[in-house]
Amino acid sequence: MAANKSKGQSSLALHKVIMVGSGGVGKSALTLQFMYDEFVEDYEPTKADSYRKKVVLDGEEVQIDILDTAGQEDYAAIRDNYFRSGEGFLLVFSITEHESFTATAEFREQILRVKAEEDKIPLLVVGNKSDLEERRQVPVEEARSKAEEWGVQYVETSAKTRANVDKVFFDLMREIRTKKMSENKDKNGKKSSKNKKSFKERCCLL
């Protein structure tokens, strides 16, 4: 399932987001709520579904590409390929299921392994189903402490009420954008340094 691409989108900045987490935590529900303002409770798990949407990020029109990966163990072997293509990750668990929170550590390790050559990977930890407070198994402080340990932001969401749904996608896009700008600056700096060195060498030869 994918959102239709419109003409002229190719020239816009594109930010690639990967949804990661155990099965049944609400990754698809969050994605569909963000894409279409719809709450879908029952969703058939697939290997991966890709979505693309044009949004305005801090006054700039950009595209977000969302890959919603299946959390089931059956798909663990192909997850590496999806992770390689991602620029930022929403690491999702359900606050009503402590096991899904514990699993985030393994998913994070997999991301770090696949993206080992990169310095800081844009990543947010997302505690979904905040509307089910009475069934909470993961204390806010426990989740926040883990996120702080990893040096990332922790946000609680509800795909049902749409609480913080836009926030997590937009905050992650900002992190991706910052990383890209930093990398471009580094590349330009190295290029400039190389050109200066080349110029000096030519001067010496004259």
UniProtKB/Swiss-Prot annotation:
Superkingdom to which the source organism belongs: Eukaryota
CDD domains: RalA_RalB
Keyword Electron transport: no
UniProt similarity note: Belongs to the small GTPase superfamily. Ras family.
Protein's name in the database: Ras-related protein Ral-B
Post-translational modification: Prenylation is essential for membrane localization. The geranylgeranylated form and the farnesylated mutant does not undergo alternative prenylation in response to geranylgeranyltransferase I inhibitors (GGTIs) and farnesyltransferase I inhibitors (FTIs). The farnesylated form confers resistance to the proapoptotic and anti-anchorage-dependent growth effects of geranylgeranyltransferase I inhibitors, including GGTI-2417.
Any one GO BP annotation for this protein: regulation of exocyst assembly
Localization per Swiss-Prot or TrEMBL: Cell membrane; Midbody
Comp. bias regions, Basic and acidic residues: 180-189
Gene3D superfamilies documented for this protein: P-loop containing nucleotide triphosphate hydrolases
Residues bearing a lipid moiety (S-geranylgeranyl cysteine): 203
Subunit structure of this chain's protein: Interacts with EXOC2/Sec5 and EXOC8/Exo84. Interacts (via effector domain) with RALBP1.
Keywords per UniProt: Apoptosis, Cell cycle, Cell division, Cell membrane, GTP-binding, Hydrolase, Lipoprotein, Membrane, Methylation, Nucleotide-binding, Prenylation
Region (Disordered): 180-206
Cellular component GO terms held in the UniProt record: extracellular exosome; midbody; plasma membrane
Organism: Homo sapiens (Human)
General function of this protein: Multifunctional GTPase involved in a variety of cellular processes including gene expression, cell migration, cell proliferation, oncogenic transformation and membrane trafficking. Accomplishes its multiple functions by interacting with distinct downstream effectors. Acts as a GTP sensor for GTP-dependent exocytosis of dense core vesicles. Required both to stabilize the assembly of the exocyst complex and to localize functional exocyst complexes to the leading edge of migrating cells. Required for suppression of apoptosis.
Outcome, altering residue 49 to E: Impaired abscission, the last step of cytokinesis. No effect on cytokinesis
UniProt xrefs under SMART domains: RAB, RAN, RAS, RHO
Effect the entry attributes to changing residue 46 to S: Reduces the binding affinity to EXOC2 effector
Entry membrane topology: Lipid-anchor
